[in-house]
Amino acid sequence: MMQPADIVAQMRQLIQLIAKHNHAYYVMDQPSITDNEYDQLFHQLKALEAEYPELTQADTPTNRVGGQALSKFETVTHAVPMLSLGNVFNQEDLFAFARRIEERLPNQQIQYDVELKLDGLAISLWYENGVLVRGVTRGDGETGEDITQNVKTIRNLPKHLQHHSVETPRFLEVRGEVLMPKQGFERLNAANEAKGEKTFANPRNAAAGSLRQLDPAIAASRPLAFYAYGIAQCEPHHGLGSMHESLQWLTQLGFEIAERQFLCSSIQEVQQCYEQIQQERPDLAVEIDGMVIKVDDLKQQQQLGFLSREPRWATAYKFPAEVAMTTVENIDWQVGRTGTLTPVARLQPVFVGGVTVSNVTLHNIGEIHRLDVRVGDRVSVYRSGDVIPKVEKVWPEFRPELAEIVQLPEQCPVCSSPVVMPEGEALARCSGGLYCAAQRIEAIRHFVSRKALDIEGLGDRWVESLLHLDLLKDVADIYHLHEHREQLLTIEKMGEKSVQNLMDAIEASKKTTLARFIYALGIRGVGETTARMLANTFQTLDALKQADIEALKKTPDVGDITAEWIYDFFLAEHNIEVLDRLLAAGIHWDAPLAPTRQPLNGESWVVTGTLETMGRDEATQRLQALGARVSGSVSSKTKCVVAGEKAGSKLDKAEKLQIRVMNEQEFLAFLAQYSA
């Protein structure tokens, strides 16, 4: 049975991966994985949270949408959040979606509005008295970027709403998708290639990149198109009763909608539409990656309501992946931040899923053996949408006679440290830790992060420059950068003031806490909570370094596997060398005066709503200091819920489960008794 710490570690890993891919997709317009691969990560996290709701992390992306807005455009708050959609991938999932709706709307006739799922960039358009006044990207669903000047250059997008048979609303907010039709995309890439300029990987990247140009003239030169898919706000209310009517009304105002739209009276008809569009997909003028199914009746939509990040009344029905055959030319090993060795198949380039694929991750040695993939093999490569491609099938009948079974390397390909793979684990790791160059940059990023040593200003640009100058071989070198001041001044855009600010931040970081220091070391499986538990239990770094596995296992929040990871970390000689150098550089923390009182040790608490006297982060920290585990969701294991203003569904669930609830004043009084 998995220990809570291991479950949390798995959740944290998924959250970090999803955040990374959200940033690549929504902010950088450079998707790093396909939609199917992203969906798999997302569903893994949702499944863990459903099974262990008390361990749900506060920053889980299952309660958010998309990525953060870029700083170069003005940030705009959406009055009505721009939510994403849930996904279904087959007929069974589709019928389950319909059953959930029917259970919530018993004895009601349900019609479904079915539309193309356009592969573009979602935006919101604001009209006042029929005049376009603002265009905003979806961003993180709550806030987006003001791209008004760029959207005004889109040729088919109405700047003035006028129609003799339709009264123009005082205010109208229309949601839709900006994309680049296939022919326009091909012409743009051909022109760029002829001029020796960068070409785009796919139409979505081209559309998103065009909208985020600071110069509207660039957007104007691109063949962009806008297709409306819904109304967010309308004053006075439009009085329409269905999605189908809403879209037709928008066309009367001058908006274009996707070239296919269906009104289905049963979920079986929806499936038939899906199969029809799948056949017609190659002939469509635009790229699509599935279909969107919505309950057509707007009143029924209101009855069904929303989950935290998606409507209950709509879902996206994704198309299946595409497959192509190619040859494995080589298999090599890459080393990640935590030392994980990942085998990568180098392929004879093959066009699949709209892109040319030449590299595919094989994940781990177990997957290699499961597939029995070898150098020289013919393989089927699977790719759907923007999902990272993968090897789906090996064809042994085409295997070369001398093809050898792939073995796990005994030494790290980067630093030559021994490779270890504990019994029962799927992943092999370099044991080099802080010594390994491949792990170095991510280890440094983690070490300087806000929740670790919090060295303000030591961002990626600094780190990359310092690595290039060979001034950072490990995290301890950070505290010797003052010895290289003249070299630092040679870095582009790093003047005297920037260098001094960095020196000041490094000096300030020397005063920390034992818990922060333990967390900063980046020991596998040791997050903030575990680091705090280790600090409270062992009180000193020396005691932690000398602890055996049995002592570590007795620490709250530390399971058997994490205990072994901690023990192995402090057993590695090169890690101890780095620790000694950090301490010699002056990193210190207050000595423990007495064992920390933790009256809430082991209890699960939830903080929800808005608190007037403190933020939720501070409330969480106060509870954690008393030993509580602060969860993002309410379950039968929850001890107490602290409810501020607009507490919402968590308060409702707590009352339903008869869990103790404190208002803000009661919570402050509760904390006061431990403030002496």
Swiss-Prot record:
Enzyme class: ligase
Catalytic activity line of the entry: NAD(+) + (deoxyribonucleotide)n-3'-hydroxyl + 5'-phospho-(deoxyribonucleotide)m = (deoxyribonucleotide)n+m + AMP + beta-nicotinamide D-nucleotide
Disulfides per UniProt: none
Gene Ontology cellular component terms for the protein in this record: cytosol
EC number: 6.5.1.2
Listed GO biological process terms: DNA repair; DNA replication
Enzyme active site: K117
Domain annotation BRCT: ranges: 595-676
Keywords: DNA damage, DNA repair, DNA replication, Ligase, Magnesium, Manganese, Metal-binding, NAD, Zinc
GO molecular function: DNA binding; DNA ligase (NAD+) activity; metal ion binding
Keyword hit for NAD: yes
Function recorded in the entry: DNA ligase that catalyzes the formation of phosphodiester linkages between 5'-phosphoryl and 3'-hydroxyl groups in double-stranded DNA using NAD as a coenzyme and as the energy source for the reaction. It is essential for DNA replication and repair of damaged DNA.
The protein's name in its UniProt record: DNA ligase
Taxonomic source organism: Acinetobacter baylyi (strain ATCC 33305 / BD413 / ADP1)
Gene name linked to the record: ligA
